[in-house]
Amino acid sequence: MKDITAMVVVQIATAGLNIFFKLAMEDGMNPSVLVAYRLLFATLFMIPICFIFQRKKRPEFTCRLMLLALLSGLLGVVIPSILTITGLALTSATFTSAAGVLTPLVTFIFAALLRMESVRLGSSVGLAKVFGTLFGVGGALVFIFYRGIEIRLWSTHVNLVNQPRDSSRDATTHHISILGALLVFGGNISISLWFLLQVKISKQFGGPYWNATLMNMMGGVVAMLVALCWEHDLDEWRLGWNIRLLTIAYAAILISGMVVAVNAWCIESRGPLFVSVFSPVGLVIVALVGSFLLDETLHLGSIIGTVIIVGALYIVLWAKNKEMKSMLTTSDHNETNKTSKDITVNNLPTLSTNVP
């Protein structure tokens, strides 16, 4: 139950990140500068936490470990952040979160191809994994493309983006370009690859805090170089007490700091599919927050898609829990057999006892 609660909190935090990113982009902030500052602040925030809570787990800083941290930073932060933020400016917060539910499908396909996730189509668990993942993606597609009647949950007259509302277009699909959609999907593929990478390398970093810190540090070096090549105007690098600074602080401390560490811990304990399947929860949260703060409109398709997504989530969780129980039962059975054999061997008479 602890890991499920952790992943729900992660999705709430990630949903808030999409809202902040949208506001920062509307304020004209350069995506590469945002990512560079985010990783710099995250590294400075996480270093003392590592020495306070995981001093004894500090890994040996070899060239191989730093290269793995660089690869993790590229796949987990730099590439998805730049692609998603750039795509977000061409789409919407709700679409970006909705596209994120493709992450479980991509993760499941890659994990199955690499034999990191068992898929037995002849068993109920295997079928539940496949159909649960597909239902989740199907629910997201319904959420995006089926409009239906308009549903007003509340009327706050709040619109933080400060853009005039166009009633002729649906809020979940307006300003969505093909380029923006491709950028967002590219970011999701990068996240899926990062999930799978974490399965192989997470234990080599000593602990989730060191994992997040080294990932942010090495990714930050690359992000800073990209930002310096992309943005030469010094005014774009100046920070004030505005939405840009708030977005950077939120992304650095809560997301790149704590959320990355929690994700690494859950991937190590429950696997990449378990983590990625919670992506649809973020879609529901963004839809509700978007309708409340960004004056986005919910429709019947949003409600139907949400129901399908939640149902799919429960199907996959059921499959994962049943699989975990089966693994624990098998492990206990093997341990019992081993102990029984040891006792039998120890009770056998030795050669010396038969000698008069």
Curated annotation (Swiss-Prot):
The EamA domain, residue ranges: 14-142, 191-317
Major localisation: membrane
GO cellular component, one term: membrane
Mode of membrane association: Multi-pass membrane protein
Chain segments annotated as transmembrane: 4-24, 33-53, 65-85, 94-114, 125-145, 176-196, 210-230, 245-265, 273-293, 298-318
Keywords for this protein: Membrane, Repeat, Transmembrane, Transmembrane helix
InterPro entries: EamA_dom, WAT1-related
GO MF entries: transmembrane transporter activity
Location within or outside the cell: Membrane
Pfam families linked to this entry: EamA
Family: Belongs to the drug/metabolite transporter (DMT) superfamily. Plant drug/metabolite exporter (P-DME) (TC 2.A.7.4) family.
Protein name: WAT1-related protein At1g68170
Native species: Arabidopsis thaliana
